[in-house]
Regions:
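Sec-dependent signal peptide recognition
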Residues: 2-7
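C-terminal motif of bacterial Sec signal peptides marking the signal peptidase cleavage site
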Residues: 13-16
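N-terminal leader/pro-regions and domain N-caps
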Residues: 18-40, 165-168
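Post-signal-peptide N-terminal segment of Sec-exported extracytoplasmic proteins
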Residues: 37-72, 78, 83
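Extended, low-complexity, turn-rich repeat/linker tracts enriched in Gly/Pro/Ser/Thr and Asp/Glu
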Residues: 76-87, 148-152
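Short, surface-exposed beta-strand/strand-loop-strand elements in extracellular ectodomains
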Residues: 84-99
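An anionic, turn-rich surface loop/hairpin at beta-sheet edges
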Residues: 99-127
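Cysteine-clustered segments with highest specificity for TGF-beta superfamily mature ligands
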Residues: 116-161
């Protein structure tokens, strides 16, 4: 019995020493793309904008990451100048070739004026992006679609915000 207590204490200490300490860091990524849609004459025109980035520049020791969680992902329209009646008739937002949003019939100026924030909450999409980011540090955001701006040119920014937590 005298030897059992020290043995149990030793086993407890050894097993607790083996537990690894997980270190996490949270970072915010904010990027924007400036989009110009020229005046249309009753017919929607194509547009395509791309933002590229690298998580290595934002998260030190990126290669040591063993888990990534996207805490939030959203986009907004901002800094609209020109035609206030321009409409995105249809568009797709992709991150690393994964569709995160499909847009249709949005008045760009109205959404900017309202301060609308479009949250991406689909867990399947977020899980897919987390897996992609674990294997590839490059981030490519693409906005492509069709728009009508019959009353003149319109310029606006499409702003993306992503908060992610990385575990080492």
């Amino acid at each position: 019995m005298k030897k059992l207590f020290p043995l149990l204490l030793t086993l407890l200490l050894i097993s607790s020493c083996e537990d690894s300490i997980e270190v996490t860091t949270t970072t915010n990524i904010n990027e924007s793309a400036s989009v110009t849609i020229l005046e249309t004459n009753g017919t929607a025109i194509n547009f395509n904008e791309v933002i590229e980035g690298d998580l290595n520049q934002l998260v030190s020791n990126f290669n040591s990451i063993n888990d990534i969680t996207i805490d939030s992902l959203s986009y907004t329209f901002a800094n609209v100048t020109g035609n206030e009646n321009a409409v995105i008739t249809s568009a797709t937002i992709e991150i690393n070739a994964t569709t995160v949003a499909v847009i249709s019939n949005i008045n760009i100026a109205q959404e900017a004026l309202n301060g609308s924030v479009f949250e991406i909450t689909d867990t399947a999409v977020l899980d897919q992006l987390e897996t992609i980011f674990l294997n590839n540090s490059s981030v490519t955001v693409q906005l492509s679609g069709m728009a009508i701006s019959d009353e003149g040119d319109v310029n606006f920014d499409l702003e993306f915000s992503m908060q992610l937590t990385a575990a080492f």
